[in-house]
Amino acid sequence: MDLYGEEPMETRRSDFGMRLKQCMDKYGPLCVGIDPHRKILTDWGYNVDAEGAELFSMRMLQAAHGRAAAVKFQTPMFERYGSRGFAALERVLYAARQMGIITIVDCLHGGLSTTISAIADAYFKPGAPLLADAITLLPYYGARSLSGLIDEALDNGRGVFIASLTSNQEGASLQTAIRQSGEYKGKTVAYGIASTAQKHNADIEGMGSVGLIIGATIGQWIKDSGVDPAKFTGPILSPGYGWQGAEAKDLKTVFRGTSGNVLVTVSRFIAAHGPDIAMLSQATESIALDVRQALLEATEEHHAEDDEESSAFGRATETSTPLTFVPVDGNGAQQSSAATRQPSDPAADGE
């Protein structure tokens, strides 16, 4: 039993993905971001302190309850208040658990093996002070450096989201850089991260528990990365919708062909309607519907194009000899069969 009197539950490595998928199927693909910015606290008439951040968070939880699949807490917004801020985050995480809401802590942790156990103690293990369903990770030490922490999460029925293609413009130069060595030599950094993450989901039936962060604002940049979200079987956390500029058309561009595993996070776009709980709830419901429809159209358009291509190919083969496809590289030169990307590779771009 932990300090809040909660009994630990028997867990499986696939638990987080299963629970998140159930909530997404029931409530839609919206994750409400709980980010107590100074300006929002002031606009709401709350004190800019730990107490104000906690009051704001509790109100956002009420709006999200029964209307969104998950909530995401931005830890720096609590860290700025020191120990009182962390205590506030503990309490709102506990409240979310009591309400049955899936929680994601956006802490962007990472590091060496010496720090992994400490992070697991804080977020994953029974009795953890900041017990969450999932946290975000930063793979700058190398995606494989996260393996131990991922195992800790999965062994405790939790999940992770690894930053792969972020919504900030500064990320492009690093994330689309070509790797010079290792297993994914010649591929982009983002491709290597996505492929490494997918390995943890490969043997899981249904949606896995190791996810990616792919921003909704990246647009056609998704093609430069070599990452195909449609071939990734874990959850995808997507910031950038609303306040940061992404619209429904951007979701359809980036997540074309995906099938129910994209979780769109929206924070200030919802919070701007507060503090009135009725207005917050209405905004949450409206945005949830918009996001669901955009992602549904992304899937349907992809399938429609595939059906059209299949029909055209069928008509062509009725009157012509069998076609032989010769793979080419980006410069139009033929590749050897050894260099051909396999369809089963989850991070391969959809060509």
Task: Annotate the PLM regions.
Residues V32, V71, D106, I135, ...:
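Conserved, mostly hydrophobic/aromatic
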Residues G111-G211:
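Conserved anion-binding
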Residues K72, R80-Y81, I104, D133-G142, ...:
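Catalytic beta/alpha-barrel core
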Residues M24-D25, L61-R67, L93-Q98, I150-N156, ...:
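Acidic (Asp/Glu)-rich catalytic clusters
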Residues L212, T217-T265, F269-I270:
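A C-terminal functional module that forms or caps the active site or interfaces directly
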Residues L251-G257, N261, A272-D306:
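C-terminal helical cap(s) of enzyme catalytic domains, especially alpha/beta-barrels
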Residues L3-F73, E79-R91, R97-Q98, I102-I104, ...:
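Conserved N-terminal beta1-alpha1 strand-loop-helix module at the mouth
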Residues I40-F56, H109-S113, A177-K185:
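Active-site mouth loops of central-metabolism enzymes
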